[in-house]
Amino acid sequence: VGAGNTPAIIDDSADIVLAVSSIIHSKTFDNGMICASEQSVIVLDKVYDAVKAEFAARGCYFLDPFETERVRKTIIINGALNAKIVGQKAATIAALAGVKVPEGTKILIGEVESVELSEEFAHEKLSPVLAMYRAADIEDAFSKAEHLIADGGYGHTSSIYLDPVKEKAKLDEFAGRMKTCRILVNTPSSQGGIGDIYNFMLTPSLTLGCGSWGGNSVSENVGVKHLINV
């Protein structure tokens, strides 16, 4: 197993309502504790405003620049995840940062630009906190996703929302470029990554192998067969 700094790309061919509702469903499950949950959303410029509006309409809170700075200094301290935010509600995390949000806020979203580790929002956060990036085009989106995976998610999970029929070439390139053992398409990444309900292609498990990319001997979801000596 390993860290899962999961990026989710929303292509301009995506069903925006499906994408946003899936990400919220995933990120609020167990308050973002599942390591396959989305840590960053990368949205193509053409649909960025529509995606932002959909997140806001569904109870997510977009931090202004001042609030973003307060939250970034709360989620990561001295280069490490602040244990006080792990699995907490969005409103609780906001309060820790001195930011006031509606009590029912589902996710805190920081609109950021850098994918470097110097950007706190680019880290794995294990809480209902998301980074949101604007991508100029699909190549820019792929590049950002690759960088975020390199920041701390090699071998784990990556996700994309698009029309898989019309944009098969994009999907094939995404699958080929992302160094993750789970490639999820139009699927909530928490539930899709752990298998079963949303993804019958994966063995149900909360222990997710990251393969040689993540320094693991197993690349699939770990089950009882991996505990048997043969």
Enumerate the predicted regions with their spans.
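Conserved C-terminal structural/oligomerization subdomain of aldehyde/semialdehyde dehydrogenase
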Residues: V99-V230
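ALDH superfamily catalytic-core signature
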Residues: V1-E116
